[in-house]
């Protein structure tokens, strides 16, 4: 009986599923977004987005408190979400949040800085 709290804690931990997402390089990311069903998502600020972004990318700033609320309003759960930020740090945060909410996510691990493809302004 004295081990019950430990066992309950262990069971709750084992019941948690880690949020999974794919983190890929720029070349692989470019191949992923060739699929027109993939949703492109820029998680940088509006100012960064205005300076240039991957064509047809939606903008949801991950630094805003309502990031997940906006994501759930705009992003379909039945489509893959391909997301990026400037360098890869914010996108990992966004990818983890989205994956925890049931989204299938592919993240550009080196960010927009490494993007060699087309840029829309």
Functional labels for PLM-detected ranges:
Residues 84:
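Short, surface-exposed ligand- or partner-binding patches at beta-edge/loop junctions that are enriched
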Residues 10-11, 45-47:
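Intrinsically disordered, low-complexity boundary segments flanking structured domains
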Residues 40-42:
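Structural scaffold elements adjacent to functional motifs in cytosolic proteins
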